[in-house]
């Protein structure tokens, strides 16, 4: 059953979920259908833009890899194959009902305000759980590891919900996605550090501020043209190649926000229906709809910094001690890795870029450390790409929640108790903080 659900893909499954949620919240059925399908149209459009980005940026990325002389032997296979690997494991087979029931239990007990409908991305929790299982040899510890990751993700979603809503321009949503949520503590820490630096304190340099100060220089189209030119020159392209990249990157800068607007347009009646429903039946209790990080990609800072990080990532990969991962399949979608930095830093370009470099260092190192386990998962799952190189990994598995949970639980029963205790403490602390606000 769950295999069939996953086979529908996000562009079909998410709209169906949205229609069902709309009907639960007493939205007229035709309006619920239109809302769900509109969300689906937005995701289809965004998928097309992502495919265009991958098709256009992959060739110059490969040229840059050759020019930088990268000789790394752990290959990044990307988030798509990684999700398949996650769901092909023993924990992946049970992850949807386990995490869904956890979410419902936390909602009922008021330990979270988020209902995570982004079920497709439960694979992040499956990867964490399976790494724990491979480290410890215990399926039970693995399931506990996945539950810990999911619980932390839900609380990070609650914690950042208002900032996400401000960036996206839509009330009643949050981001519990397994990777995005795991980057939140680091970005919050870095934001506090930036506030201690004199020339960064109290300043917010986003695309709108640049446009206000320097006119058309801050326009997304112009930013896209400049970034495309940088890509072309870095890849040694001639006039034709540079011109093509300039137009393509400018298109990405413009089309991503347009697709996000479609998703937001579809979510508006559902969000409004949810608000009215909970005001009427639950005395105004606030509940968020948990979505994929994709809904944050419309911000110019996320797109611009994400694209800038592509050549930076290749340089980092070549000089970072301990890194063995060759960034490849996940590289064209680099904006996904720093979308929560944009949220935490309120769209500030400089802060988001610095934080992006720092978080990608952690991503490379964790992806390197997880490579043996990820390769073993892929081989056991019968994935053919696992036999094409000595080891494989994915940048998208390099998240800090997965790493910290697996490291603790690898210590055995004491580590498991400590990990569960820390997660429970974080959940209760953030809940107490919410009640005091």
UniProtKB/Swiss-Prot annotation:
The keyword Membrane applies. The gene is sgcC. One of its GO terms (molecular function) is galactitol transmembrane transporter activity. NCBIfam families: EIIC-GAT. The keyword Membrane applies. The lineage of its organism: Bacteria, Pseudomonadati, Pseudomonadota, Gammaproteobacteria, Enterobacterales. GO terms for biological process: carbohydrate transport; phosphoenolpyruvate-dependent sugar phosphotransferase system; sorbitol transmembrane transport. Residues 2-437 form the PTS EIIC type-2 domain. It is a multi-pass membrane protein. This is Putative permease IIC component. The EIIC domain forms the PTS system translocation channel and contains the specific substrate-binding site.
């Amino acid at each position: 059953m769950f295999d069939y659900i996953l086979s529908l893909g996000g562009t079909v499954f998410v709209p169906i979920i949205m229609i069902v949620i709309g009907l639960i919240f007493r939205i007229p059925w035709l309006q619920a259908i239109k809302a769900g399908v509109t969300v689906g149209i937005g995701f289809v459009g965004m998928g097309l833009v992502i495919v265009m980005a991958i098709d256009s940026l992959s060739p110059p990325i490969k040229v840059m890899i050759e020019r930088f002389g990268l000789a790394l032997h752990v290959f990044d296979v990307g988030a798509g194959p990684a999700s398949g690997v996650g769901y092909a494991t023993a924990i992946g087979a049970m992850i949807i009902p386990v995490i869904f029931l956890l979410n419902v239990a936390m909602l009922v007990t008021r330990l979270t305000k988020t209902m995570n409908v982004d079920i497709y991305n439960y694979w992040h929790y499956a990867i964490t759980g399976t790494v724990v299982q491979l480290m410890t040899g215990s399926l039970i510890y693995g399931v506990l590891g996945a539950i810990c990751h999911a619980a932390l993700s839900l609380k990070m979603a609650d914690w950042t919900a208002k900032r996400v809503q401000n960036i996206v321009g839509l009330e009643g949503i949050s981001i519990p996605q397994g990777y995005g949520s795991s980057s939140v503590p680091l970005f919050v820490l870095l934001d506090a550090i930036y506030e201690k630096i004199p020339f960064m304190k109290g300043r917010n340099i986003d695309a709108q501020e640049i446009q206000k100060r320097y006119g058309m220089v801050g326009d997304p189209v112009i930013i896209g043209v400049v970034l495309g030119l940088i890509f072309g020159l870095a890849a040694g392209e001639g006039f034709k190649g540079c011109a093509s990249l300039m137009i393509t990157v400018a298109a990405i800068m413009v089309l991503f926000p347009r697709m996000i607007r479609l998703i937001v347009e579809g979510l508006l009646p559902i969000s409004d229906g949810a608000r009215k429903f909970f005001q009427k039946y639950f005395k105004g209790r606030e509940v968020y709809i948990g979505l994929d990080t994709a809904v944050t990609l419309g911000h110019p800072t996320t797109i611009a910094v994400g694209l800038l990080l592509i050549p930076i990532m290749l340089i980092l990969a070549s000089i970072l001690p301990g890194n063995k991962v060759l960034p490849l399949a996940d590289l064209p979608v680099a904006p996904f890795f720093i979308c929560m930095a944009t949220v935490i830093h309120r769209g500030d370009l400089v802060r988001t870029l610095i934080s992006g470099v720092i978080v990608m260092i952690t991503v490379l190192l964790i992806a390197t450390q997880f490579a043996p386990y990820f390769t073993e998962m892929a081989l056991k799952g019968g994935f053919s790409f696992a036999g094409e190189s000595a080891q494989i990994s994915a940048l998208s598995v390099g998240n800090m929640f997965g790493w910290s949970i697996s490291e603790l639980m690898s210590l055995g029963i004491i580590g498991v108790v400590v990990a569960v205790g820390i997660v429970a403490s974080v959940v209760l602390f953030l809940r107490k903080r919410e009640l005091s606000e």
